[in-house]
Amino acid sequence: MKDHLVRVATQDGTLRATAAVTTELVDAICRRQGTDPTASVALGRLVTGTALMGSLLKGDQRLALMIEGNGPVKKLHAETDALGQVRGSVKEPISGIAPTETGFDVPAAIGRAGFLHVVKDLGLKEPYRGMVQLYSSEVAEDLAYYLTSSEQVPSTVALGVYLEKDGRISAAGGLLVQALPEGEEALIALLEERLVALPPITTLLRDGKGPRQIIEELFAGIPLGRNEETPLVFRCTCSRSQVLGMLKTLGEEELKDMAAKDEQTSVVCEFCKERYSFSSDEIKALIA
């Protein structure tokens, strides 16, 4: 099943929801980052949550989510655009947190204390920036807490990453359900009951159900209006010219020191791990 998301809204405007399968996306990002199993689950959850929240973007808008905690992975970062092009990174890919009999201790990897940062480029003069303390460090609950408390949209988020015994990611996906203003309380209550009874996302995906089937099961008997599908892919926006521009922002003295070493300067993209190398002459050309 190719990675994609399905976004729907009820005809009466009471609810909207997005379901996604992100298995290939999460696997591609975690392989590039070299994550251990627990870090893979933590990063995979944030990548999936970013894709879900990105379904609300339009045009050239972009979204970035960052989790900074006092755990061994230190920082998780994921970005997306309205086209479903996603990338992600982790500061320390080896969490050292072994899987337990019941699963993965993601809060131990992230840390119990920390913050969720949200940055939205909506095409305005300045990006929108939001921040909340981590609610549980499970990622899904942290995103739901942010959406409900900061954006004032009651939200439920479910995220899952399933690893085989050999560490291979065999299923990843998520679900975002939001209640809109002046929604019908009875309908919201019905959805809440169904969400409680819904099996884990990875169980549904491993049973062969895709985002559309998950949505149809959740909203059975409820008239739907808008219904959109978007492919999800890993894509990094870095480039050689972009890195040169970043180097140019360094101070003149620092650039002179780099150029004087008469050896190549290398910069590695934190997301895709592409290495960009520049000669001392190229560094000298950056000095005004």
Swiss-Prot record:
What InterPro entries does this protein's entry cite?
Heat_shock_Hsp33 (IPR000397), Heat_shock_Hsp33_C (IPR016154), Heat_shock_Hsp33_N (IPR016153)
Q: Where in the cell is it found?
A: Cytoplasm
One GO cellular component term = cytoplasm
Q: Which UniProt keywords apply?
A: Chaperone, Cytoplasm, Disulfide bond, Redox-active center, Zinc
Molecular function terms in GO for this entry? Answer: protein folding chaperone; unfolded protein binding
Disulfide bridge positions per record: C236-C238, C269-C272
SUPFAM superfamilies, A to Z: Hsp33 domain, HSP33 redox switch-like
Q: Give the UniProt record's GO annotations in the biological process aspect.
A: protein refolding
Q: Which superkingdom?
A: Bacteria
PTM info: Under oxidizing conditions two disulfide bonds are formed involving the reactive cysteines. Under reducing conditions zinc is bound to the reactive cysteines and the protein is inactive.
So what family is this one in?
A: Belongs to the HSP33 family.
| Biological function | Redox regulated molecular chaperone. Protects both thermally unfolding and oxidatively damaged proteins from irreversible aggregation. Plays an important role in the bacterial defense system toward oxidative stress.
Name of protein: 33 kDa chaperonin
The upper taxonomy is:
Bacteria, Pseudomonadati, Thermodesulfobacteriota, Desulfuromonadia, Desulfuromonadales
Q: Which gene encodes it?
A: hslO
